[in-house]
């Protein structure tokens, strides 16, 4: 019996962009949000939570030969992003890991709890990339909107749950979080929450599952899995913009412009005709 096009669409737009993130004995989930070729190289980016990769971020006192003294030096260790392979759409048959670099982050202690990874595979684009909810349409997200949470719950291959947006005005460490009833648990952190757009006929990424409600019970605490906090898409966009990666969602900004803002060199192939004219002069 043929698989329903609706089921295929859900797999391709929500399930397959999900990756598992492993970082020095800890782990969680991530979502592929961009994968394009610029010049001769592919550039693939994954969004996750800071607390998923925090063990790979440290600051050490190291000798600076120019300043002639020990200075705080940021050390970023390698992170591993795991893609999954499936048979008949739904049956996971394994995974393969690719090294990735932490290129931007905001610490969990500051309330933001966000990180951006760049996959080191420069030859092959990611096969599936999440559709991002348009920044100009955020005011049309409401309580009772159906949603789906997808992530590597408890370290498993991706698991999908459904629910609805149930609260949009909680503040944790002075930053706004939204809440959904789509069940999430440890390991979902860094994954994705999706909402279907009737207008654009696609499932769209609207936030990062980041926290779960915990109820103290005597000497232990029980997780309330149907009350999960997620970082709303508006904050995700602000973080990307603050770190000069807004080409990921903003069509008015180019990859090259953002790279220049970050002080990175742009390959000649990416500079276009203006670069060629400069060389001729």
Residue ranges and their predicted role:
Residues 49-51, 152, 198, 211:
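Short, surface-exposed secondary-structure boundary micro-motifs
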Residues 44-48, 113-121, 178-180:
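A generic structural motif
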Residues 36-43, 68, 89-94, 110, ...:
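Short, solvent-exposed loop/turn segments that connect beta-strands within catalytic domains
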């Amino acid at each position: 019996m043929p698989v329903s096009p609706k089921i295929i669409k859900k797999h391709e737009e929500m399930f397959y962009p999900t990756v598992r993130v492993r970082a020095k004995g800890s782990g969680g989930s991530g979502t592929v949000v961009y994968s394009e070729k610029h010049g001769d190289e592919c550039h693939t980016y994954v969004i996750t939570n800071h607390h998923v990769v925090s063990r790979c971020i440290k600051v050490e006192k190291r000798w600076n030969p120019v300043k002639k003294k020990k200075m705080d030096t940021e050390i970023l260790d390698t992170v591993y992003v795991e893609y999954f392979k499936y048979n008949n759409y739904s049956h996971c048959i394994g995974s393969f890991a690719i090294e990735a670099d932490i290129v931007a982050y905001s610490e969990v202690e500051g309330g933001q709890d966000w990180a951006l990874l760049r996959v080191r595979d420069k030859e092959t684009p990611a096969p599936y990339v999440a559709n991002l909810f348009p920044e100009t349409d955020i005011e049309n997200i409401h309580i009772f909107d159906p949603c789906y949470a997808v992530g590597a719950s408890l370290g498993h291959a991706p698991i999908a749950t459904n629910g609805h947006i149930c609260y949009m005005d909680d503040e944790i460490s002075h930053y706004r979080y939204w809440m959904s009833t789509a069940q999430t648990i440890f390991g979902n952190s860094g994954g994705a929450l999706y909402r279907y757009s009737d207008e654009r006929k696609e499932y769209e990424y609207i936030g990062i599952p980041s926290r779960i409600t915990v109820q103290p019970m005597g000497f232990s605490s029980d997780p309330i899995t149907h009350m999960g906090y997620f970082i709303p898409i508006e904050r995700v966009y602000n973080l990307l913009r603050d770190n000069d990666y807004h080409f990921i969602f903003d069509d008015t900004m180019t990859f090259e412009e953002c790279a220049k803002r970050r002080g990175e060199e742009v390959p000649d192939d990416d500079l276009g005709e203006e670069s060629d004219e400069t060389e001729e002069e």
